[in-house]
């Protein structure tokens, strides 16, 4: 494909004249890897087709929601039926009650839930709720964890534990982030020092249990255990951001994975998104009844939304959750994902390239490093130039991974063994070229 025949390019030029950067979310612009974004025309199963009609094996899946693949028959049927009943009412429906029941059935830490329209909205509301429920202002977050683009959470680390964070975006006043303390992921000593200094002021600790915006970095079990202990000890709320991991890594979400090693483990507030909407704009946050009843109209913490509980989105999410709750679903999904990461690792190492990978359920990540990183500074040591070469080599061969070094990948139940084999074969060719170059 040459620039003169690539139909994605004129679409991108048209978009750039109308939309900042030509995209409606920055990572889609290919700024990190260079080149022209692929404009999707349609998708089905494990594939999408771009403006040129080229088919790609899709390992993004709308950044996680498409756990069943694109166009699953049961989901399509549910959405079509709901659309015939009406797009939006601004009033309660039975379907949103059914979706709430389905979510709570699988996530026992949540006794009540509030539906919203995006992960950012859910995260922002969870922080407001934590502050309202505790009467405190300080929030802990971790370097490299992304919780949406709410002002108070667009923060990078300060110069030390005695100082609070600095905004990572223009337009965010310093006074908005002065109550946000940023720590290094998986650093128990730093965590303990933060609570020793500020414990009585901390409303909540917000964490991605698997940091999907550092590609794929797990919170260690000892670190997570200490997060829970310190929050309990100091009266702070543990807020689990499972927008990405919720129903993606296990039916009980990532918190159920940690509960295997930490008896009785539960967060205080859980933030969900992506999979629970099945690809439509839907997210949620929830927790124990005593905390959730602090929300309006019952309590003093205000939260509202015109499209919250949208009837078409809830139909999509409900159909998705009912499909993934079938026996054996996650076992098969995890096996397929491990086949992918294992095959990629073998192919890279055969060419003498450093490579490490990890996965849980249908979520995975890999690094061009000999060992898995444990926090943002170690993630940053990976070879960006080699990753970009790998990305474009796979893209040329019809395999679509995230166009950024620091984003997780996703396998769906629609990915076949043949898709995995085709991907590994393509990667083997690219690793050979990268190693030689």
UniProtKB/Swiss-Prot annotation:
Disulfide bonds: none annotated. GO terms for cellular component: cytoplasm. Pathway: Porphyrin-containing compound metabolism; protoporphyrin-IX biosynthesis; 5-aminolevulinate from L-glutamyl-tRNA(Glu): step 2/2. It is an enzyme of class 5 (isomerase). CDD domains: OAT_like (cd00610). InterPro entries: 4pyrrol_synth_GluAld_NH2Trfase (IPR004639), Aminotrans_3 (IPR005814), PyrdxlP-dep_Trfase (IPR015424), PyrdxlP-dep_Trfase_major (IPR015421), PyrdxlP-dep_Trfase_small (IPR015422). Its cofactor is pyridoxal 5'-phosphate. It holds the Pfam family Aminotran_3. Gene3D superfamilies: Aspartate Aminotransferase, domain 1, Type I PLP-dependent aspartate aminotransferase-like (Major domain). Keywords: Cytoplasm, Isomerase, Porphyrin biosynthesis, Pyridoxal phosphate. It is found in: Cytoplasm. The keyword tRNA-binding does not apply. GO terms for biological process: protoporphyrinogen IX biosynthetic process. It catalyses: (S)-4-amino-5-oxopentanoate = 5-aminolevulinate. Its main location: cytoplasm. The modification N6-(pyridoxal phosphate)lysine is found at residue 274. One of its GO terms (molecular function) is glutamate-1-semialdehyde 2,1-aminomutase activity. Its EC number is 5.4.3.8. PANTHER family: GLUTAMATE-1-SEMIALDEHYDE 2,1-AMINOMUTASE, GLUTAMATE-1-SEMIALDEHYDE 2,1-AMINOMUTASE 1, CHLOROPLASTIC-RELATED. Belongs to the class-III pyridoxal-phosphate-dependent aminotransferase family. HemL subfamily. Homodimer. This is Glutamate-1-semialdehyde 2,1-aminomutase. It comes from Paracidovorax citrulli (strain AAC00-1).
